[in-house]
Amino acid sequence: MQLKIRNLSKTYANGVVALDRVTLTIPAGMFGLLGPNGAGKSTLMRILATLQECDAGSVFLDDIDVLDEKDAVRRMLGYLPQDFGVYPKVTAYDLLDHFAQLKGLSHRARRREVVDGLLQQTNLWDVRAQRLGTFSGGMRQRFGIAQALLGDPRLIIVDEPTAGLDPQERVRFHNLLSDIGEERTVLLSTHIVSDVADLCANMAIINKGQVLLCGEPQELIYGIEDFIWARFVTKAELPAFQARHSVISSRLLSGRTLIHVYAEDDPGEGFEPARASLDDVYFATIAGRHNPAAGNC
């Protein structure tokens, strides 16, 4: 199954351009949409989830017109929004059972089989009788995935699913998404580079409503590996280096500041070639330093 987005645009009433002629082809498997907050990711997710209208463009899920055939899309869609509410005094089992009825699973035995299976798949079986108000953030996100999987959707959209999760819950959630992505098209929207690096076979970087880069993560890393240089500097030296070089990132490492710069030639001043990562691709692209053709997105 393939999702084709062509020249999708959206401008809000206050003049903010959320999407500017976005064009993407999203194949089966895990696809990462990576960008900072305010890049237009959530607007795109809501349009694809048939919750918001666009101004122009087209979206096709195989041969289904997503913008015109919303009911058909909803029958094969699972959606986990960035923010979603639950009934805090209802148990996980009862609420998932209720959602299953709303999805059309009216036969009690079949519904029980589906609900039981999803709670086990999301590692919530042992807490199925707990009220949702007692769940941690990670448990709530896994419950969100369980409801998104009702109806065996072919397309799943998850918007910023790991924001706010502790490292252990993030690993658990990554494993869950990885299993799901083996059988479906999963569109993952995030500002966390490691989410895409760990999970996605294909990705795109979006900022200010425009797709800047797309491709396979490892291929994008290969495309930048000759241009990344690194060295340690003191905190006092950092502003001067930022003025003289295209510094794309800085971070503390063992109490010292490690900077990465983007340069086509040796920048001198003690810089050494650095092994490029997806972080370098992301930061250089967002900063406007790395501008290859977007290609056939």
Q: Which residue stretches match the model-derived regions?
A:
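ABC transporter nucleotide-binding domain
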Residues: 173-260
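Conserved structural motif at the start of ABC-family nucleotide-binding domains
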Residues: 3, 18-19, 74
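Walker A (P-loop) phosphate-binding loop of ABC-type ATPase nucleotide-binding domains
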Residues: 36-40
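Conserved ABC transporter NBD signature motif
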Residues: 57-68, 72-73
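Catalytic Walker B motif of ABC-type/P-loop ATPase nucleotide-binding domains
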Residues: 156-160, 165
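Conserved ABC ATPase "signature" region
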Residues: 97, 101-104, 109-127
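Helix-to-loop junction immediately C-terminal to a conserved catalytic motif
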Residues: 49
